[in-house]
From Swiss-Prot:
It comes from the Eukaryota. Belongs to the xylopin-like family. Coiled coil: none annotated. The modification Lysine amide is found at K18. Its main location: secreted. This is Melectin. Expressed by the venom gland. GO terms for cellular component: extracellular region.
Amino acid sequence: GFLSILKKVLPKVMAHMK
């Protein structure tokens, strides 16, 4: 579902935020 996609993308987003 959407949450599984979110959990997959979130680490990448956090990496870009750094």
